[in-house]
Amino acid sequence: MKKRVNIIIPAITINLELLKCLKEINKIYYSNFFVTIVLNYDSKIKIPRFKYKINKLLAGKINMSKKRNDAVKKFKSKYIAFIDSDAYPNPNWLKYGINYLIKKKADVVGGPGIPFPKQNYAEKISYLSKRSYFV
C-alpha cells in the first residue's frame, strides 16, 4: 500500500502561478496524496477540481517556514513534500522520493526546482536569480 503524502504549498494568495502548480501536481504518477495550500489571505479566484483533495489554510502574513510548519501540524500524513507555488514537480516526484526514503532508510530527500517550460526571458532570469547562491 502506498504511504500517504501531504504536499504543502505556501503562497501569498491564489494566483495564476499557484494554479499552474496545482495543474502540474494533477499529473503526478502517485495516487495516495493530498495538497495543503497555506495562504496569507483568501482570494476570489476559484480553485478548479482535481483528482486529489486540497486543504486550504489561511495563516495570515507569516513567513514561509511557519506556513509549512503549521500545515504539517494541522494535516497529518506519513510523508511530507514541499513545493513552492511558482514551481512544478516531475510526474515521478513522489514515486521516486518515497521509494528512496524507504530503500535507503533516509529521513529527507531533496530535489531540483523545475521552472515552468514556457517562461519568457524575464521570468527565467527571475527564477534563476531566486535560486542562485551568488545573489
Residue ranges and their predicted role:
Residues 80:
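Short aromatic/hydrophobic "clamp" motif used to bind/position activated sugar donors
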Residues 43-50, 92:
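Acidic helix N-cap motif at the loop->helix transition within catalytic regions
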